[in-house]
Amino acid sequence: YFIREIKDKNLVKSVKDFPVYVDSPLAKRATTIFCGDLRGYLDEEALALVQDGTHMFSFPGLHLTETVEESKLLNMDRTPKVILSASGMCDAGRIRHHLKYNLWRPESSIVFVGFQSPGTLGRTLLDGAPSVKLFGEEVAVRAKVVNFQGLSSHADHDHLVNWISQFKEPKPQ
């Protein structure tokens, strides 16, 4: 949603029309599901966008990768891009390959949007490690590492209380 808005408003002046890659088979399937009718699941702001014809999870330049080969090609192409990769703590999955090929590049940014537990690679990066070990190699951290608070996909306390309050008393068994 936010990336689509950034692209729509041309907020990244240095790269006119950067591509965005969702690099996770599960995220690809979830995105496909969310491209359906979501009217019963959206807040007022999101519903207004949909009613105006905005596609919440689709925009020009969005690419959904699925295969390992597609994922590997992203690291071989030096075109400026956004790669959205799963494994929030960076301890497994495709993100580790993206980190290996991009952490050492000062023009890269590694952006976290969720909590990083102590002892994870994600927390190590946020804590400012000068280098990390990936696939048996020491990789210098020259990329800018940032954490955006408030974008986690997990519900907060108020949302959880609101959700659970919608349930009726359980039926006797």
Task: Indicate where each model-derived feature is located.
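Acidic/His-rich, metal-assisted hydrolase cores and their charged scaffolds
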Residues: 1-173
